[in-house]
A protein has these predicted regions:
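Beta-strand C-termini and the immediately following turn/loop, strongest in propeller blades
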Residues: 1, 9, 42-48, 56-58, ...
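Polar, glycine-rich mid-to-C-terminal structural blocks
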Residues: 2-46
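Short loop/turn segments immediately following beta-strands, especially the blade-tip
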Residues: 9-13, 57-61, 102-106, 199-202
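Non-catalytic accessory segments flanking enzyme active sites
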Residues: 29-57, 62-80, 112, 123-124, ...
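Extended hydrophobic/aromatic segments used for targeting, binding, or gating
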Residues: 63-117
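Hydrophobic, well-ordered secondary-structure elements that form the walls
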Residues: 99, 132, 194
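Generic long, charged, amphipathic alpha-helical segments
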Residues: 108-128, 137
Length: 223
């Protein structure tokens, strides 16, 4: 299990690396990731049902990770940052998760962003300059929702006329200043497809489709 995080300065030898975080519990595994806005590093330490996070600014030359919320058995959470705000995806007092928002991790004045819903699994967030995309799962069906940041209006992102399908979003480019995302989906009667989708005008272009060597016609199937 990964238990330590070191700071390495490019050009220096490994023995010069500085330990900045160490997990004492053998049951927990440590990972580190860059925030969506590339302003913070988040250190995550967790086992299968409990997590704890620390953060520090990317500009810190001598990082001192700060605790976000102390671990609480059975509570999972994951914090992200975007446009001066912090978002916390957690199952604290929310069996199927919720998302809270705050302007400061020091004050932690958390307010609801996405409320928990009965028998609806709330997924995480994907950030673009003008949009926030998130997922939900209910009745074994996955859905995507897109929120316009300037208007704060949210609507379901529907890009297929099929009732039963599995959608997903992938950012294949690092540029967040765009209205275009790559959306993939598959269904019981349709092979996997990837579309380039414009969130602003809702246009889509098919860019990839799974080939079935024996041939396949979706119209021959009823779901």
């Amino acid at each position: 299990r990964a238990r330590k995080i070191y700071r390495h300065e490019i050009g220096n030898f490994k023995d010069k690396d500085k330990l900045i975080f160490e997990e004492k519990s053998e049951a927990f595994t440590v990972s580190i990731g860059l925030s969506s806005d590339e302003k913070y590093y988040f250190i995550n330490t967790s086992d299968h049902n409990t997590s704890e996070q620390y953060y520090f600014n990317v500009d810190e030359s001598d990082p001192l990770p700060k605790l976000i919320m102390k671990r609480d058995r059975g509570v999972l959470y994951s914090t992200s940052s975007w446009d001066g705000k912090f978002y916390n995806h957690t199952n604290k007092n929310a069996e199927d998760f919720k998302i809270d928002i705050t302007d400061s991790l020091e004050k932690q004045d958390w307010k609801p962003f996405i409320l928990s819903k009965k028998e609806v699994l709330i997924g995480g967030l994907t950030f673009l300059k003008n949009w926030i995309i998130r997922s939900e799962t209910s009745n074994a069906l996955d859905k995507l929702f897109v929120r316009n940041i300037s208007t704060n209006l949210e609507q379901e992102l529907i890009f297929s006329d099929e009732t039963i399908y599995v959608p997903g979003v992938s950012l294949v480019q690092r540029d967040r200043d765009t209205d275009e995302v790559y959306l993939g989906y598959s269904s019981p009667k349709t092979p996997s497809r990837v579309y380039k989708y414009n969130l602003s005008n809702k246009s889509k272009i098919l860019v990839k489709e799974q080939e079935i060597p024996s041939g396949h016609n979706p119209e021959n199937y009823i779901v």
